[in-house]
């Protein structure tokens, strides 16, 4: 994989910049932490070299100064809101986050329940946390929020919220997902800190959009693609331009709310420490791009993936909004992209046409070589492409059988005769298990298995929608999957994916 981002430089520069921001205030900074902390795969895809846990590693450099406060909305507890990527409810994700932070040595100070409502589910959640030794605090709904600034910054607003007792200079405010109330918690804490004579500060940590690269840079366009369902729009920060005469990038929600936030700062502290939304941020990622061309190409690929993902969701569930698709089409146009233009797509379609329109797949390896796979009597197309790619990487002739038909056929019998399956062909996970069994007695199979890490970061395209098993396996291998929004049996009404 070509590297476009200096991760070591980022860890050092980002942690130092946060230390400097802490010093600007009364040695107390509330840092609103947006995005994913442990597994930012979007950032790792568009900034090759950025590690999925880079933000966590950066925080670990500050762990002696930092404590974590996790925020969850009472509404999300009551509605049992689910985090899509993990398939667990927000309240359970709070427990998962506590474990994850503590396992790496970060101090979790407390959990704050926002928009507090005296519901049985909320009280049970608080009781459970308290029994585990985790302190909980309550913040309440404020009538007129966020526009009635005079009421919000008063004893009838933030003053009603419980003051979250914290011990360390850096308080990281994070949450299971968006809409939990992280910024409101930060500002409420500033109100209470100033009441106690502590001139604390606030800052916002968001990786995207990157403020010091062009508005229409592919990295920033890829962020818009990632948030197309929210209809976030990157914009030139007009406040920063007016204050400093410098063009920077922010996104619409932060720009729209800035006058309100600024007014709150003035009421809390007497004057605002910031002249623009960009000022509030601490993101240093833009300074660590070392090969712009690599990041541009990676980001263009990400935009295409997001577009395919939207089309597939529309086909499978019908839940993706038309507005989301239109937004992604606009971004495709802005980035000069078209469907079917990538070599991995072209070769997958060519293989399908060469086999009478049967499902086919292609994998683009890190050296640019594209390996294809067809649907056969033993393997599905993606399983075939996977085995062919491993052979190529291991220098094994393509005609070599790494797993014999005699080993595959009993698995097919198990699937169809005993487990009620209708498709005898092996999925990607099944062929990998068969390959691992063969590796015990075959040096060639073992050599192929050892190439699995080299599939990480490779693009794979299927000419039909894949089963959840195949999609999950590609994901676990770190491969970047796209599919045509077409079922293998298009005339059927029910499709098991």
What label would you give each PLM region?
Residues 177-178:
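The conserved Walker
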Residues 374-375:
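Short clusters of small/polar residues that mark proteolytic maturation junctions
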